[in-house]
């Protein structure tokens, strides 16, 4: 099945200082090592009714990396409003290109986006909050 977002990214001609890394399959350690070296994380997804890309979002936030992501209304992070990344509409080729070029040409702002993302991860996506939410669900279903 064709993915217009991936095709849009592949059509972009990245600047010399941008490496595009596509990883397919489950290689968690290798993926984590590659992501940690990145200047930015790009998450390009199909239009869905579920949270495609959420794990990658949380990982990028935790690593303090700015994010460029398809505007999936199911992802509970408004990257633009929170200042931790850039959202791009599905299939918006020029939007993807502008977002990548912006991150590449504004390294200090990209660094600040990453810092804001890390702060968000520490506040919202931490083990304490996760444990509390799991405990609440278990408590609810055990009644």
Label the predicted regions.
Residues 8-30:
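Nucleotide-activated donor-binding/catalytic signature segment of Leloir-type glycosyltransferases, i.e.
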